[in-house]
Amino acid sequence: LATGLGISSVVIALAAQDIAKSFLAGISIISDRPFEIGDYITVGDLSGTVEDITFRTTRIRNADDQVIVLPNSVLSDNNIINSSKRDCRRFRIVLTLELDTPLKKVTQLTENIKLALTTHPQVINETVKVFFETISADGIDLSIDLKTSALEYVDYLKFKEEINYTLLDMVNQAKIGLAYPSQSIYLKKD
């Protein structure tokens, strides 16, 4: 009987310790406010929109519309990325042009892309970088990197779509082909 009571006491003490840790973490979250209801956060491999914050737990809803209940102690023990607090979003793409593209066309396309991007109203101009990055077996890589003021996810998707259409149109107007990975297979006669 004494052994049973001893084990029960240890289990209760451990449970109380976890509850106390989550409660103290909840107080810290509520006072420090690293995120608020409605913010989109990432904790470890979990991401979602914060729906509720209590002293013991935080509820987030993920992209699959599932509610995840996290003990606040888990939040306090991990890095929290609050995507709702950012000032801008990064857009990066690499265009791979055909290897036989004349250098003059590559240079002109690079300059035209820079001009088009720096005049776009949602592009933060000083962040635009367009460079002839490398020559690979697949083709000539143009690296395009910038930041945009389109913060909301749907707005960002629309921005990306618009930029991708613009880039594709510019490549087509320059009469430059986009490269794609290919392989040559040589058959040997015996």
Regions found by a protein language model. Name each.
Residues 2-15:
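Small-residue-enriched core segments of transmembrane alpha-helices in multipass membrane transport
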Residues 12, 59-61, 143-145:
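Short, acidic/hydrophobic/Gly-rich beta-strand patch recurrent on exposed beta strands
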Residues 27-124:
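Soluble accessory domains appended to multi-pass membrane transport proteins
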Residues 81-83, 89-92, 97-190:
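Solvent-exposed, non-transmembrane regulatory segments of membrane-associated proteins
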